[in-house]
Amino acid sequence: MVITIALIGRTNVGKSTLFNKLTGNRNDALASNHASLTRDRKHGFIIVNNTKIVLIDTPGINEDSKKKISLDKEIFEQVKFSIKQADLVCLVVSARNKLMHKDVEIIEMLRKFQKKIFLLVNKIEGLNFDLVKYEFYTLGLRNMHFISATNGIGIDFLTNNICSFFTSQKNSLYKKNKDFDIIYSITNDKKNCCQNLNKTIKIAIIGKPNVGKSTLINVLLNEKRVIVDSNPGTTRDSNWSLIIRNKINYMFFDTAGIRKKNKISTYIEKISVHKTLKILNLVHVVLLVIDAMDGFSDQDFYLLNLIIKNGCSVIIILNKNDKLSEKMRINVLNSKMLKLISHVKCHFISAKHNMGTSIIFKLINEAFFNSIKKIHTSKITEILKLAITKHQPPIYKRDRIKIKYAHIGKHNPLTIIIHGNKLEKLSNVYKKYLTNFFQSKLNLVGSSIVLYFKSSKNPFIK
C-alpha cells in the first residue's frame, strides 16, 4: 500500500520549500521567490513514526489556470491528477498575503473530490498570530496548521498529526495500480535510494530543449507524468519516477534541456542545468534524446562526451522518426559522430506516436547488465596483452613504458585497473587506444569503460 499526500495551492505560497523541508532535501525541488517555478509534479518520500508516506509537490494554481488553453491548463490538469491520487490533500496558503479569493475557490474545488483536507497556513514568521488565526478560521476547516516552512515552525506538530490521521484511516486506505506498479521513493542521499529494492536501474533522460524528453517519459510511464509543450524549456526541474516492469525497478529522471553555455540567460535556467548535470553522478544509464530532424549537433556531441566521461552507460534515442525519409535516416546513421562511438546503440523512435518505444526497456537492460557483467581477471589480462602486442606502449627517455597486468576495480561503470611502470607518462592517444580495444573485445554495447592506471613505485627511489 502506498500512502500519498498532495501539496496544493496558489503560486509562490511555499509548497516547494515545504516539500524540501519534509523530505529533508534542500535541493530536491527548485524553490525560489519567482512565481510558477514548479511546473511538473514532483514526488518525495518521507517517514513519520515508521510510516512511509509519498509526498507530491504540485505546480502552483494561477488566477486563470482554468481559463488558459495552453501551459496553465496543462498545469491545472497535473494538479487535478495529484488530487485524485492522494489520500490526504494539504492546501498551502500564505499568511503574508492573507486569505485570497483564489484560496477559497481552491477549497471549493477540493471539496468536490471528497478528500480529507489539511489547511497549512505558511509564512507565519514575524506576524501577529491571533490576527492570522482569526482570518483563516473563517474557512471552517477542522484541520488547520500554522507553519513556517523556511524556519521549521510547526513542522513537527504537522508531521505528528499527519501520522495520527493515517493511523486512524489505515483500514480504508488501499491502492491498486493498473498496467504498471508505480512506487515513488526518495532519501537524503539518492546514491543509496531504493537500497531495499532489488535491481533498481536509474535512468536519466537528457538532451537539448524541445527534443521530446517529457513526451518520451510520459510514454514510458504510461501516464501524463510531466507537462509537454512546444515551447523550449517547459521542464525546469529534474523530475523522477520509479516503476516496476517485469520485476525490475526502473527509476527515470526527466531533466531540463541543456543549451549551450552562452545561451543560458536566466538564473532559474542555470540552476536547472546544474541539477541536470549532477544527476549524471547518480544514474546508471542515460538516454540521450536527439531530434532526428536536426541531426547531431555540437551540443549533442558535448553532452555525449559528458555522459561517457561520467562513466554512464548511454543509448542514443533519435526522436521524431515519423518525420524522416529513409534517405534521411541513412544520413543520420552515417554521421561522423556515430563512427567515433561504435559501442553506443542508436534507436529511432517517435515518442509522439509511440513508435519504437517498447524496445527501450530492453536496450536499458542490455546496457545496465553489461556494466555489471562479471569478467574474470585472466580474460582482462589476456585482452591487455593482445592490445600491447598489436600496438606497443610508447618509449619514454629511451625506455619503453611497461604495462604488466590488469584487473577489474569495480562495476558500473566497469573500471579496469592497469598496473605497470611509468604509466603516468602514457599519452592520451594510447590510453584512448586501450579503452577502445577493451570496448571492442568485451563487446559491452552501451556501457562505458573507465581505465585507471597505477604505476609501481621504485623501491630504490626515495
UniProtKB/Swiss-Prot annotation:
GTP 1 binds at residues 9-16, 57-61, 122-125. Pfam families: KH_dom-like, MMR_HSR1. Residues 3-170, 201-372 form the EngA-type G domain. NCBIfam families: GTPase_EngA (TIGR03594), small_GTP (TIGR00231). GTPase that plays an essential role in the late steps of ribosome biogenesis. Belongs to the TRAFAC class TrmE-Era-EngA-EngB-Septin-like GTPase superfamily. EngA (Der) GTPase family. HAMAP family: GTPase_Der (MF_00195). This is GTPase Der. The gene is der.
